[in-house]
Design a protein with these regions (language model features):
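Acidic, glycine-enriched catalytic cores built around paired aspartates
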Residues: 1-282
Length: 282
């Protein structure tokens, strides 16, 4: 969703408001993975109107996207109830046809199990640790992302676009009504703590602000950026067979948040390592 919100904001701004590009140009740029359209890619990527920076225009687009998702869930719930749960009183042919599509025949769930039987739709927004794999099957997008590159992790800002600090990232969540998604809407933040200057109260204040800004699910970690960059270079040496894998052993204790779970930094794929390094913020 963050990629989509950023892309729509770029199209709104550069195509319809500033008339800097025309829509066929943008479409052709995406089809060609920005080859020959580097100016468009740079304009899209470097624009500051990105979700997670407390920018009202793109936050409003995100609110619309969440509204579409929520209303779609309500419609799916209604269709599911009509098709499987409730005992039909009309539209018998349509309901029978819908059941056939799902390879189901027979009585409604209420007829089988009683009126207390229900079907729960738990809506949420998340990628877990699959954001790199998901991106491999997605073409170039109008937020400046190239084909095959990772998408945003969970509901976090697109990696590398959180420019205004964690306070503004949290403020972007305030008016999105995330509590309506019972399966959760997760954000992952990694704070640079290279110099060890952040005390416990600093992290407590982030959690308090997250709650006050109506956040849903938060994973918060801190990292020594210099140390992780050094470990990444050692991983590169191992990957390129310049170093023995034994060179990684002293760093096996360094765990990072992947998305739904923690893992040693040295064990995650290169793309996820790069994503994590670019995610670290002040």
């Amino acid at each position: 969703m963050p990629n989509c919100a950023n892309a729509l904001e770029n199209i709104k701004k550069f195509v319809f408001e500033q008339n800097r590009y025309i829509l066929p140009q943008v479409v052709d740029a995406l089809k060609n993975n920005f080859k020959g359209y580097e100016e468009i890619k740079n304009a899209f990527w470097n624009d500051n109107n990105k979700f997670g920076n407390n920018v009202k225009e793109v936050d409003a687009i995100m609110k619309q996207l969440l509204d579409f998702s929520y209303n779609g869930g309500l419609k799916a719930k209604k269709l599911g109830d009509e098709t499987f749960i409730l005992t039909p009183k009309k539209d018998f042919k349509r309901i029978e046809s819908n059941r056939t599509i799902c390879h189901y025949e027979g009585h409604s769930m209420h007829q089988k199990y009683g009126d207390d039987f229900n079907m729960i739709f738990n809506l949420g927004c998340g990628t877990f640790g699959q954001y790199t794999l998901m991106g491999k099957n997605v073409g170039a997008s109008a937020d400046g992302r190239c084909s095959g590159k990772p998408v945003a992790a969970n509901f976090s800002s697109v990696t590398g676009t959180m420019k205004n600090g964690i306070g503004n990232a949290l403020a972007s969540l305030k008016n999105l009504k995330l509590s309506r998604f019972p399966a959760g809407v997760a954000v992952d933040y990694c704070i640079d703590d290279t110099n060890g200057e952040n005390c416990d109260s600093y992290f407590e204040n982030i959690v308090r602000e997250f709650i006050e800004e109506n956040g849903s699910i938060l994973t918060l970690t801190f990292a020594n950026t210099d140390e992780l960059k050094n470990v990444f270079q050692i991983c590169e040496g191992v990957r390129n067979k310049f170093l023995s894998s034994e060179a990684l052993r002293p760093y096996s204790y360094i765990a990072v948040r992947v998305g739904g779970f923690n893992a040693p930094f040295i064990t995650i794929p290169k793309e996820q390592q790069c994503t994590y390094l670019n995610r670290i913020t002040k």
